[in-house]
Amino acid sequence: MPVVFVAASKLPTPFATFTMHGFLDEATGREHVVLSLGDIADGQPVLGRLHSECLTGDALFSQRCDCGSQLEAALQAIAREGRGVLLYLRQEGRGIGLLNKIRAYELQDGGADTVEANERLGFAADQRDYAICLPMLEHLGVKSLRLMTNNPRKVKALTDMNIVVAERVPLHTGHNPHNRYYLATKAGKLGHMLGNEHQGEVPQA
């Protein structure tokens, strides 16, 4: 996987001053970022998150998803721990891109769920590729994670790459009336582990 390290700098945030590591995927031209805090190369499991880019949720405060809340909660958790890593992956819209995500939102406004919308546009329900994470984690010396996620695909992807997932740390945040159906679909159709409040809420055909 031709993902190469480019540069690193300090990044002060309201939560902590992180080190920001920039990486380039030479195959796609996509630029990815890792935020790290503390000694993450000591061989002990590192609190971490794989966070896929979500412009609408992360930067525009959208309540259609829980992405922005999860990003903030993950950074806060790392800051509290004093040690951790967050991989910010440029895989907008579960890998379909921003404009296609807006097209998918348009279909959702017409009644489709998040999976149906992607499929109607000719995409898989989730097109993200986590193989790009391996060279970034190797560069940083991270071999074991306490992974903040509700998504079992992320756990499997890391395990398949021989990255130890020592613990799955749930991220239950960002629930609101606007994303109730979206979260139910993620639980019912994508297998996300979101708790009993979202199980069985997906309308049956």
Swiss-Prot record:
Record's GO cellular component terms: cytosol
Binding site for GTP: 49-53, 70, 92-94, 114, 149, 154
Binding positions for Zn(2+) per the UniProt entry: 54, 65, 67
Cofactor annotation remark: Binds 1 zinc ion per subunit.
InterPro entries per the UniProt record, alphabetical: GTP_cyclohydro_II, RibA, RibA-like_sf
Superkingdom classification of source: Bacteria
BP GO annotations: riboflavin biosynthetic process
Keyword hit for GTP-binding: yes
Protein name, as recorded: GTP cyclohydrolase-2
Cofactor: Zn(2+)
Annotated active site: 126, 128
Gene Ontology MF terms in the entry: GTP binding; GTP cyclohydrolase II activity; zinc ion binding
Segments crossing the lipid bilayer: none
Role this protein plays: Catalyzes the conversion of GTP to 2,5-diamino-6-ribosylamino-4(3H)-pyrimidinone 5'-phosphate (DARP), formate and pyrophosphate.
Keywords from the UniProt entry: GTP-binding, Hydrolase, Metal-binding, Nucleotide-binding, Riboflavin biosynthesis, Zinc
Reaction equations catalysed: GTP + 4 H2O = 2,5-diamino-6-hydroxy-4-(5-phosphoribosylamino)-pyrimidine + formate + 2 phosphate + 3 H(+)
